[in-house]
Each structure stands twice: as C-alpha cells, then as structure tokens.
C-alpha cells in the first residue's frame, strides 16, 4: 500500500485490519488445528500448544470480565477466535502501515497525525448503534464481540496505541504494560 493511497483514504487502514484479521484466523484457536493441506490434525509442538492455550485463556478471561450490560458479561470463550484475530489483525495492519509510510511521512489532517488516524480508522470501522435487546442477543449468540469491544478490547493491549495517543495510567482504557495481552 503506497503512502499516497494511505493519505487519500482511511478505508485502507480498516481493509488492512480485516486482511490481517483473516490471516490470523489461520492460527487462532480453531485455525491452528488444520495443517497446510487443510487436514484437521495437531501439527504444533506440545510446548507451543501449551503456551498458546495459556495465553488464549488470558484473552478469554479478559473478555469474560467485560460487563456489556448490567448483569450480562461478554463470553470470552465464545468469542475467543474472533478476539485473537481482531487483536492480531490490528497489529499486522499497523506493521504494514508503518512499513508503507516509513520513507514518506503523512501529514496531520484535522488535528490528527497519521498514526492517530490509523487507530481512529480502526475504531470507526466497527462503529455501530444497536439496541439493548440486540446487545443482549449478540452477546449470547455471536462468535464476534460487540463492535465496541472489538475496539476497546483490542487497542489497550497494543503498545503503539499508548504511544500514539500518549495514554497514561489513570486514563479510561489504560492497562499496565505487564498485564497487556500479547499472543504472538
């Protein structure tokens, strides 16, 4: 992706996130169970499976702790694969974006620098306005976290987001560095 195109359309950031998201599915809690030929079999080393499961459990626990509505928490086990892909997809897209812009910095537009616009585009891509009833329904049935948590559940675990927005202890979505999740 050229710096020129990134400067012209924030849509490319969200496209990068979606492509990264789909790539990560090949290595999430379900995709990792299939080998290069698409056959379902365990092909990882036992030590890698153990480390993966340990870290994946931390993601499930993090999302389980999110109170979506009074008396209703997210289901981190149900949404695990999608949450891993959301988090990983943003990181893949961020690295691609930084690589594409390293020799051609982008300008500040509307008071936001290019790095800030990257993360704002990620958030904007999941913007939605749904009813409480739909929130309840999706929380209990959908393998995807609610759109709000696809953003607010992923970004606070990405160091670049902290640096980009100068997020500090005491800020609403702040998570101490040692508690941030990182699967890869």
Language model features by range: what are they?
Residues 1-7:
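Single conserved hydrophobic/aromatic residue that forms the stacking wall/gate
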Residues 8-16, 26-184:
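Zinc-dependent metallohydrolase catalytic domains
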């Amino acid at each position: 992706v050229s710096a020129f195109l990134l400067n012209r359309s924030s849509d490319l950031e969200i496209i990068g996130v979606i492509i990264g998201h789909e790539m990560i599915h090949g290595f999430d809690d379900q995709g990792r169970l299939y080998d290069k030929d698409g056959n379902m079999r365990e092909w990882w080393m036992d030590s890698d499976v153990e480390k993966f499961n340990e870290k994946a459990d931390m993601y499930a626990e993090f999302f389980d702790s999110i109170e979506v509505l009074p008396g209703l928490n997210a289901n981190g086990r149900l949404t695990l694969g999608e949450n891993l892909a959301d988090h990983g997809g943003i990181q893949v897209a961020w690295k691609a974006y930084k690589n594409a812009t390293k020799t051609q910095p982008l300008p500040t537009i509307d008071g936001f620098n290019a790095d800030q616009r990257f993360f704002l585009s990620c958030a904007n891509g999941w913007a939605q306005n749904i009813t409480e009833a739909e929130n309840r329904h999706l929380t209990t049935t959908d393998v995807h976290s609610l759109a709000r948590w696809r953003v607010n559940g992923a970004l606070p675990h990405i160091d670049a987001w902290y640096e980009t927005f100068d997020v500090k202890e005491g800020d609403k979505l702040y998570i101490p560095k040692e508690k941030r999740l990182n699967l890869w």
